[in-house]
Amino acid sequence: QFGSSIYMILGTKELVDDERLWREEFIVPGLCDISAGTNAAGSLTKWYRNTIFPDALELEQNGGPDAYITMMQDLDKIPVGSDGLITLPYFAGERTPINDPLARGILFGLTLAHTRQHMYRSALESVAYSVNQQLKIMLEHDVPIDQIFAVGGGVKNDLWMQIVADVTGKEISTPAITVGASFGDALMAASGIKYSGFESFNKLTDFIKPGKTYHPNKIG
């Protein structure tokens, strides 16, 4: 879930004992899950919009394009790694794996040669590396992960999704309906009450139409 924050969930057959992650019994009998979260994702891009790109927001408010579209202009010209600018995305503390509300964000390596486009790309990259950090911990428990299904407002950003695919080395798939949490809740509720056509949990994916797919490029 690429929303204001990131929430990752992976189904498992048994409860996993790992204090770096959240773990619980899943709503479907016989299944469990492990999950993880990054506190600043969409909230970080919103901070950049309001603080670093106020002109893009003003342009939108005056009838121009969406501010986030304006912010993406020329971002693809910034090289992978943002010319050495590294962001630690702990702008609102951090959830897993460190579980520290007092953690703080960092811009490391900032020079006079960097632009706000460098800063913004570095922020997007930092969230991707946070996702990868969580993913690596999940993979320690011998649960195969071949593909990441991403939902939420952040999936509208093609470059961001490609960065996540490149950093994790995993294929990223998005659905046609990107408001994943509420749509998924509705499907689960329909299945729970055995609403006609939704009785089988295993067939709920039939109602999820595919959107875009991002294939990882080799980096580094």
Annotate each language-model stretch with its function.
Residues 10-220:
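Glycine/Thr-rich phosphate-binding loops that ligate phosphate moieties of nucleotide
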